[in-house]
A protein has these predicted regions:
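A short beta-strand structural signal in non-transmembrane regions
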Residues: 34-39, 89-126, 135-136, 384-394, ...
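Acidic-histidine catalytic/liganding microenvironments
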Residues: 55-61, 272, 329, 378, ...
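Juxtamembrane extramembrane loops of integral membrane proteins
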Residues: 3-59, 65
Length: 695
């Protein structure tokens, strides 16, 4: 699949802010520049102009500004040397005069392939012997190129292989037989490749989130295989264990896969493109995993019927002791878990959101280091763009110029605006005598390739670019709001740019977090009611599904960790995966109740039958997610960390909270219709429990 980590793809697709930005791009071109920092060089050094000229000749660069090129354009319009130096300081020349910058504007072909353009720029710098500490390189295209490099298949392959090794070892520990383990892992690899093929056919693109798709598909497939094998082990005493196991397994497995599908599909409510695609791709992975694992794992058991062995009696007795302790003290267990979840849940009110393109990169990245150094010593790459629309006004050029200058002064008054740039920046503050009416002279002085940067549609649209500080990403939103306030009485002014889009993305992410979680919760609850045909049991069973999410997100709220793209997706996905174990236990509980057992005995039997595979499946899934911590992308790391934490918490909720809640369900004792097919040792422990209840 082709890689696409363009920053704009992470911004809301449909919004008023996005529409305004698209209009800005149509009139002035994309707001994308590559900033080259040259330490310890003076503007008059021949090397500076040589580099600028070579960069201008690249097909991906439409023009490269150097300090001398900025200055010469101003000199042509009679700007004084003192004023030129003042205007270039903080834009192309550092305040301490120990660094200067080249501003390379991307051409349409450069926008098509940013990575190739950045490589061409690096070749020019290398040819000019500007390497290491002798040059700094940053800008949106540089960040995108680095994201594409890190998102390459070769980088994802590392933690995928690591995950494959870990999960293979864990599967062998659970199964205890190499042939069956190898067969399951081959099915898993097939499911991953089939998922990638379907996503590719659907037109999907690779980005750093999609790097987690292979691990997600692996986890789905292995979880289903673990449950199929467990059902088979529990049916070994029956005449046809495979047929019996499939008869009992298909419903909870299919419903679990459906819940996972719902959790992932709920992400498709997002207006952020990569999140939408990840939701679709993950949902495809859930379906493919169901077909492969439920369809092919029985074939392995048919091929090697003796590969799956029953649990040892010592291990079974340990499980029964634990189950007995849980269901015999349901009130204490429920109260303890409830208090812990409630205390952590208070942290939900402290959740906040944040999106910063630099957070996508490793903290030690040279791209991040260069950006921070350039912003500290030279200028920021973040900007808010003001579009001034004179509509059909026939006012003279100079009248418009003075009006733009007044607006620019207002915008520059904000404390977080570090520098402004417009057509007026190339003209003197006071026009020399004889120039006032010479519009033809101004048009000639500002060549079309320069005019297009700040003028459009003749002289209708004028642009003022405001560079803003980025020390605190939260300041972007406040700065945008303040600039809107400063220009509120000027209807001709419209504000746009990447910075306000990022602010809009933060709100979209936070809103999408709650929307995807609530929609998946409601749909899964409805699915519970329809499949179990019991509203009370369904609502009771949803409590342990939401508890791990409340627990983990409450903790990050207490810790003050902001919700980013990676964390935002975990809630609905984890909910769909946590339901996996819940379905198996609820169906086992319901079958036992229908057989005439009490709530406490049914909870005990359900925990004995499903507790071990629930724990194994969650452990395998957690280990798979932990491998994502090896990713170079911070959001992917946070996604893996959050998913692992929630899945591990689901073991605690599934093996303690759920059986305790089930044991508390009221209901009249029914006549025992039949005895469940359970190991004799289980009955030996169950009978005293039933007798104790009767007493």
């Amino acid at each position: 699949m082709p890689s696409n980590n363009d920053i704009e793809t992470w911004l809301p697709i449909e919004s008023e802010v996005r529409s305004t930005y698209e209009m800005f791009k149509q009139e002035f071109g994309a707001e994308e520049v590559i900033l080259v920092g040259l330490p310890n060089l003076s503007p008059d050094d021949p090397l500076v102009e040589s580099v600028a000229e070579r960069l201008s000749q690249l097909p991906g660069i439409r023009h490269c500004w150097s300090p001398n090129r900025f200055g010469q354009t101003m000199r042509d319009l009679s700007v004084s040397e003192e004023k030129i130096a003042e205007r270039l300081t903080g834009l192309a020349i550092a305040k301490d005069k120990r660094m200067l910058g080249l501003v390379a504007l991307l051409s349409p072909s450069g926008l098509v392939d940013r990575s190739a353009t950045v490589r061409d720029v690096e070749k020019v710098l290398d040819y000019c012997q500007l390497r290491g500490e002798n040059v700094l390189l940053t800008g949106g295209p540089v960040i995108v190129a680095e994201l594409n490099r890190l998102g390459d298949v070769s980088h994802n392959r590392i933690f995928f292989i690591f995950t494959l090794i870990l999960t293979t070892a864990l599967m062998y520990h659970c199964i205890g037989e190499w042939k069956l383990t190898a067969g399951v892992m081959l099915i898993t690899v097939f499911a991953i490749e089939a998922t990638n093929a379907v996503v590719y056919w659907c037109g999907g693109e690779m980005n750093f989130l999609m790097g987690a798709l292979a691990v997600m598909t692996m986890v789905f497939t292995l979880s289903i295989a673990v449950h199929v094998i467990n059902y088979y082990k529990n049916s070994l005493d029956l005449p046809d264990p495979l047929a019996n196991s499939l008869r009992n397994a298909w419903k909870p497995i299919a419903l679990s896969a459906l819940s996972t599908f719902i959790g992932l599909a709920s992400l498709m409510t997002s207006t952020i493109g990569p999140v939408w695609w990840f939701g679709l791709s993950g949902a495809v992975g859930a379906v493919v995993s169901l077909v492969c694992a439920l369809g092919l794992t029985p074939a392995l058991l048919l091929l090697w019927p003796d590969a799956a062995q029953k649990a040892e009696s010592r291990s079974l007795m340990s499980q029964m002791r634990m189950a007995h302790a849980v269901v015999s003290n349901p009130w204490k267990t429920t109260a303890f878990v409830g208090v812990v979840v409630a205390v952590c849940g208070v942290g939900l009110w402290s959740l906040s959101c944040r999106i910063d393109p630099l957070d996508f990169l490793p903290k030690g990245s040279s791209v991040v280091r260069d950006l921070n150094e350039l912003e500290k010593r030279l200028t920021s790459i973040d900007s808010i763009e003001a579009i001034i629309d004179f509509e059909t006004s026939d006012a003279p050029f100079m009248e418009k110029l003075y009006r733009v200058r007044e607006i620019e002064a207002r915008l520059a008054s904000d404390s977080n605006v570090t520098h402004t740039m417009s057509v007026a920046s190339f003209f003197p503050d006071e026009m020399p005598e004889g120039l006032m009416g010479s519009t033809q002279f101004f048009t000639k002085a500002l060549e079309s390739k320069h005019r297009s940067d700040f003028l459009s549609a003749g002289e209708r649209y004028w642009r003022v670019s405001c560079r803003i500080g980025r020390e605190d990403p939260a300041m972007k939103g406040r700065t945008f709001a303040n600039l809107k306030r400063l220009t509120a009485d000027i209807p001709q002014v419209t504000l746009t740019g990447i910075a306000p889009l990022i602010e809009q993305a933060q709100l979209t992410i936070f809103q999408g977090f709650w929307e995807s979680l609530s929609s998946s919760f409601l749909l899964i609850t409805v699915m519970f009611v329809v499949s179990l045909r019991s509203l009370k049991l369904s609502l009771w069973g949803m409590i342990p599904n939401i508890s791990p999410i409340v627990l983990v997100f409450g903790i990050i709220g207490w810790a003050g960790v902001a919700v980013d793209v990676g964390i935002m997706m975990t809630a609905s996905i984890a909910l769909g995966m946590v339901v996996d174990g819940t379905f198996h236990m609820l169906i086992a509980y319901q079958r036992s109740r229908n057989a005439g057992h009490s709530s406490q005995t049914s909870a005990f039997q359900a925990l004995i039958r499903t507790g071990k595979p629930i724990c194994e499946a969650a452990m395998i899934a957690s280990v798979g997610m932990v491998a994502l911590l090896m990713s170079s992308f911070s959001p992917t790391v946070r996604f893996g960390m959050m998913m692992a934490a929630i899945l591990l918490s689901s073991i605690w909720a599934g093996l303690l909270q759920l059986p305790a809640l089930l044991a508390l369900l009221p209901g009249k004792r029914q006549r025992k219709a039949r005895t469940l097919a359970m190991p004799e040792t289980t009955l030996e422990v169950e009978q005293p429990l039933v007798q104790r209840q009767a007493a």
